Amino acid sequence: RGLGDVYKRQIYRGGAVIFRGTEKCTLRDCYIHHVGGNGVFFDKYNRNSAVTGSYLTSIGASAICFVGDVAGVRSPSFRYGEFVPLDKMDTAKGSQNDNHPAYCEVYDNLICTIGLFEKQITGVELSMCRNITVSHNSIYDTPRAGINISEGTWGGHIIEYNDIFNTVKETGDHGTINSWGRDRFWHPNYNVMTQITDENPALILADVVEPIIIRHNRLRCDRGWDIDLDDGSSNYQIYNNLCLNGGIKLREGFYRTVENNIIVNNTLHPHLWFKNSGDVFSRNIVMTKYKPIRVYGWGREVDYNIFTDSLSYLAARQLGGDAHSIVAAIRFIDAAKGDFNVADDSEAIIKGGFRNFPMNNFGVLSFHLKQLAESPVMPVPLVAGHVTDTKTMLWKGVTFKNLDTLEERSATGMDTERGVYVVSVDALGSPVRDFIAPNDVVLGINRKSVNKLSDMKEALKRADTQKEVEFIIFRNQKEHKVVIPL
């Protein structure tokens, strides 16, 4: 299903250097610059080939791409709203052919100032490929992700020891390391997808047949998430990462194990979790409250974490998890210089089970690339305090608020932070429960634009004397006109 090249975007299968049908070929110690399109493109069949020790800068599109043959994807869909009916779906595991990159490597490269012309690009693109290792790269100054995993087809990647920052500079709803799932089980309607996965659990890992590992990276995103697993991304192992600003988001999906990460000044962002997701979030250093959106179950285990303040810990306990988690005063060894390890005698290690990991091994290794490579700005660690309550509005059993957070924008698929977000609907007492649903966004009432709560209040005042009111609601990535009788 994945189709990263034709699904989320169209991609040009070309570049300054093209690998096609290669085995054991390496681009080593090269300088690729001032290229109008892609830098290096691995197209379809490639095995055990690599890009190492190179400097890629001033690139018009993506720096390095691995993109397999669409014909290898079983039961593909090509647009967001499309879905292959289950009775017509090929349910076999894995690829239909071997016409894709596999067992290739991107090692010790400096990638910066890319996406000069195209914006839906990335430093390293992985689409319809398997077992690609991306390690010891420094990637920064990008309009979108530093590393993008377009879909689950077909997993087995290892992403490690990279230094990635200054990303998502010209777009939004994205991450420094980003993934789109959208494998065969995925459906744009969450309720339909829930039914599919309940009845056909074997489909969950039919495309991502091997786990994808994200470990030992230093990541910073100031306009999104440090790690963003979107749209049902499944079968991930995420551990020993230093997340400097944006936190970790897991939307939909199954079998994500997130352990022993340091999440500076941020937290876990669980979006639309399934009741039986199999997710694990454990032994992480967490510095703010969890930010859940429409979580229907808390996975296999959300517990044994280390919170840096009691407010965040108590909020987590109220959600029903973290029974064995602790609150500990965290003193990083030298945060200003990038050492976010904690003392060996700290409570995080003695009671919380956290394990320090190396802080001096991120990014490029070659001497000449180290001399050129920049480093991220180190954050000042903050302890969370009381936050003023968000303003809400209650109308006919429906609770509304301004859509004003990145989390709400991502969960709804909105283009910007605008409109009025539906927080909850009283399933028994609301007379409009058949018309408005949680996670809807109200964009208009009676042909008047609604950008914030005050707009909505004014529009509803005028509608009080009418027999019906017309809402424009954004739901499942589309605007809908809904007429509600009063």
Segments from the language model and where they lie:
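PDZ/PDZ-like domain segments forming the peptide/carboxylate-binding groove
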Residues: 399-444, 448-451
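PDZ-domain C-terminal substructure recognizer with occasional recognition of PDZ-binding tails
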Residues: 437, 443, 449, 455-486
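Short, small-residue-biased leader/transition segments that mark boundaries at the very start
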Residues: 2-7
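Solvent-exposed coil/turn segments that connect beta secondary-structure elements
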Residues: 69, 182, 403, 425-427, ...
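Acidic, glycine- and Ser/Thr-rich low-complexity intrinsically disordered tracts
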Residues: 73, 175-176, 180-193, 276-399
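Right-handed parallel beta-helix
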Residues: 23-37, 46-61, 73-92, 96-115, ...
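Glycine-rich beta-solenoid repeat tracts in large extracellular/virion proteins
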Residues: 15-21, 38-45, 62-68, 92-100, ...
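C-terminal, low-ordered peptide segments at domain boundaries
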Residues: 384-417, 478-486
